[in-house]
A protein has these predicted regions:
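Conserved thiamine diphosphate
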Residues: 29-30, 34, 38, 44, ...
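Active-site diphosphate/adenylate-binding microenvironment
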Residues: 63-140, 145-146
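Short beta-alpha connecting loops at secondary-structure transitions
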Residues: 21-29, 124-128, 165, 169, ...
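Glycine-rich, acidic loop regions that bind phosphate or pyrophosphate groups
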Residues: 1-61, 232-235
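Thiamine diphosphate
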Residues: 112-189, 230
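A short alpha/beta connector and helix-capping loop motif
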Residues: 26-39, 167-186, 258-260
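Glycine/aspartate-rich loop-and-adjacent alpha/beta segment that forms the canonical ThDP
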Residues: 1-2, 210, 225-267
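Short gly/pro/ser/thr-enriched loop/turn and capping motifs at secondary-structure boundaries
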Residues: 18-22, 28, 38-39, 111-112, ...
């Protein structure tokens, strides 16, 4: 993989704690300061020295790369193939969500795909599981979000692996009357693996919908892209009646989330 920074770049670190300055692997310029004050001073120092034309060629190159990535993504978003591509699932979820919905995304591939394709329009209405190590928090986050905002639509988009870590909280939703919708990107194993040689890759398409149904949830199993939206609408009807819902969507196990259009990323 290429380095994240140009080897010739000068790297600076601003930290309010003097003891933290040299904890980074490499620091060329260390500044002990309040970051807000220091950045204000840097902006003032750069005034008139940097204009939009300064980095125009770089911006043009990025814009061209972004345009090609947008075109690639658009093809996948409209893909009707089965098993369903995770980006197609994300498109259906994004189109379905209310503008003020609370969206929780948790998993590996689906977390990255969700960041690339599902916008959020209201501050503090999107919750992610974060970078590595926190997988499984999606469903509990969704429960908390619905309790905090009972009048808002709350949807949790899970990978099947991350869902399994706290799947029993569907029972919590039923017992305590927390009507959220959980959508599972069911790719049948841990992470995408086009070569099929990773341990834990082929665990099968499990019927988490039947488990949720046994708890008392509204639950559906979806295998066709055209059936996603109707299933989401029925889940919303169940939520309106006070019932939690789970939509288990069979997803392409070979789809690996790579960097796509820069301008479409959200956190």
């Amino acid at each position: 993989a290429p380095p994240r920074f140009n080897a010739d770049a000068t790297l600076g670190r601003i930290d309010i704690a003097p003891t933290e300055i040299d904890t980074s692997p490499r620091v060329d310029i260390g500044v002990v300061a309040d970051i807000k004050v220091a950045l204000g001073q840097l902006i003032a120092a750069c005034d008139g020295k940097i204009t939009p034309a300064t980095y125009q060629s770089w911006r043009d190159r990025l814009a061209g790369t972004n345009a090609s990535k947008v075109a690639e993504q658009e093809k996948v978003l409209a893909n009707d193939a089965t098993p369903i591509h995770p980006l197609r699932l994300c498109k259906e979820v994004g189109d379905f969500l209310d503008r003020d919905a609370v969206l929780v995304v948790d998993g590996q591939e689906i977390l990255n795909y969700g960041r690339q394709s599902i916008p959020t329009f209201t501050p503090r209405h999107r919750i992610n599981s974060g970078c590595f190590g926190t997988m499984g928090v999606g469903l509990p986050f969704g429960v908390g979000a619905k309790i905090a905002k009972p009048d808002n639509q709350v949807l949790v988009l899970h990978g099947d692996g991350s869902f399994g870590l706290n799947a029993m909280e569907m029972d919590t939703c039923v017992r305590h009357g927390v009507p959220i919708t959980v959508v599972i990107s069911l790719n049948g194993g841990w992470t995408a693996d086009p070569d099929g040689d990773k341990p834990g890759r082929d665990l099968g398409y499990k019927r988490y919908d039947l488990m949720a149904e046994a708890f008392g949830c509204h639950a559906e199993y979806v295998e066709s892209p055209d059936d996603i939206r109707p299933a989401l609408e029925r889940a919303a009807e169940a939520n309106a009646a006070g019932k939690p819902a789970l939509v288990n969507v069979v997803a392409d196990h070979t789809a690996r989330a790579t960097t796509t259009a820069f301008t479409r990323y959200t956190t």
